[in-house]
C-alpha cells in the first residue's frame, strides 16, 4: 500500500467519525427538546 492511500483512508475515517458525531449530537439535542 502506498503512503498516500493510507493517508486518504485515515482522512476518510476521520470524516466518517465526525459526521457520526454530528448526527448523534443532533439526535440527542432533538430528543432532549421533546
From Swiss-Prot:
Ranges in a coiled coil: none
First-listed, main subcellular location of the protein, grouped into a coarse class: membrane
Secretion signal, residue range per the UniProt entry: none
GO biological process: photosynthesis
Localization annotation: Cellular thylakoid membrane
InterPro entries cross-referenced by the UniProt entry: PSI_PsaM
Transmembrane annotation, as ranges: 9-29
GO cellular component, as recorded: photosystem I; plasma membrane-derived thylakoid membrane
Record membrane topology: Single-pass membrane protein
The keyword Transmembrane helix belongs to this UniProt entry's keyword annotation: yes
Highest taxon above the source species: Bacteria
Keywords recorded for this protein, A-Z: Membrane, Photosynthesis, Photosystem I, Thylakoid, Transmembrane, Transmembrane helix
Family: Belongs to the PsaM family.
NCBIfam families in UniProt: PS_I_psaM
Name listed for the protein in its UniProt record: Photosystem I reaction center subunit XII
Organism (species): Prochlorococcus marinus (strain MIT 9515)
Gene name as annotated: psaM
Amino acid at each position: 500500500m502506498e503512503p498516500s492511500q493510507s493517508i486518504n483512508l485515515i482522512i476518510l475515517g476521520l470524516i466518517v467519525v465526525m459526521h457520526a458525531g454530528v448526527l448523534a449530537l443532533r439526535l440527542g439535542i432533538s430528543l432532549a427538546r421533546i
